[in-house]
């Protein structure tokens, strides 16, 4: 059986990052955009853990900080989405114009 190497992890992380980036660029629903950002952050975590396999455990420690940041970003983002929905009754990015007078 073949060993799963670092390159395999990096390829999976690159695919996750590309899928997340395409989701952020193409979607108009705020919830889907937040999920795509979480996918990008998970790709970053996978890269950090893969490189910590080669260069020590610092990548794993930093990955924990990225997860904490992602949780805080999700909480704040969902709070903003709820505020948007209460004001405009939509979560579509194109229809939300709270900064316009």
Swiss-Prot record:
It is an enzyme of class 7 (translocase). It is a multi-pass membrane protein. Coiled coil: none annotated. Its EC number is 7.1.1.-. GO terms for biological process: ATP synthesis coupled electron transport. InterPro entries: NADH_UbQ_OxRdtase_chain4L/K, NUOK/Mnh_C1-like. It catalyses: a quinone + NADH + 5 H(+)(in) = a quinol + NAD(+) + 4 H(+)(out). The chain crosses the membrane at residues 4-24, 31-51, 64-84. One of its GO terms (molecular function) is NADH:ubiquinone reductase (non-electrogenic) activity. Keywords: Cell inner membrane, Cell membrane, Membrane, NAD, Quinone, Translocase, Transmembrane, Transmembrane helix, Transport, Ubiquinone. It is found in: Cell inner membrane. One of its GO terms (cellular component) is NADH dehydrogenase complex. Its main location: membrane. The keyword Aminoacyl-tRNA synthetase does not apply. The keyword Electron transport does not apply. NDH-1 is composed of 14 different subunits. Subunits NuoA, H, J, K, L, M, N constitute the membrane sector of the complex. NDH-1 shuttles electrons from NADH, via FMN and iron-sulfur (Fe-S) centers, to quinones in the respiratory chain. The immediate electron acceptor for the enzyme in this species is believed to be ubiquinone. Couples the redox reaction to proton translocation (for every two electrons transferred, four hydrogen ions are translocated across the cytoplasmic membrane), and thus conserves the redox energy in a proton gradient. Belongs to the complex I subunit 4L family. This is NADH-quinone oxidoreductase subunit K 1. It comes from Koribacter versatilis (strain Ellin345).
